[in-house]
Amino acid sequence: MSAKKKPTITKQELYSLVAADTQLNKALIERIFTSQQKIIQNALKHNQEVIIPPGIKFTVVTVKAKPARQGHNPATGEPIQIKAKPEHKAVKIRALKPVHDMLN
């Protein structure tokens, strides 16, 4: 019972679509996307929030430390020890209202 894979726009397809829509060449589009990625990475390293219009929000969140705990192997029911996880940072990506409105 395998789920059908949703169609995905690849990076190269995205570059081609943007190039066709803006009438700019693909090399320039690729440089723009690469620059955008670097800017987002730099902002997140400095704990800055980034919003990409029309409404995708990137934030850095701190995930609390989790202590070691007892669990069980779901296949065998055998008890296992789950390791503790230290506090760490993660990126949270959220679609804002304008993006949700696009779907309705």
UniProtKB/Swiss-Prot annotation:
Top-level taxonomic group: Viruses
Marked site: Important for DNA-binding activity: R69
Compartments, as annotated in UniProt: Virion
Entry's induction text: Expressed in the late phase of the viral replicative cycle.
Keyword annotations from UniProtKB, A to Z: DNA replication, DNA-binding, Late protein, Virion
Role played: DNA-binding protein that plays a critical role in nucleoid compaction, genome replication and DNA replication and transcription. Binds to both ssDNA and dsDNA with a binding site covering about 15 nucleotides. Displays DNA-supercoiling activity only when associated with the viral DNA topoisomerase 2.
Protein's recorded name: Viral histone-like protein
Organism listed in the record: African swine fever virus (isolate Warthog/Namibia/Wart80/1980)
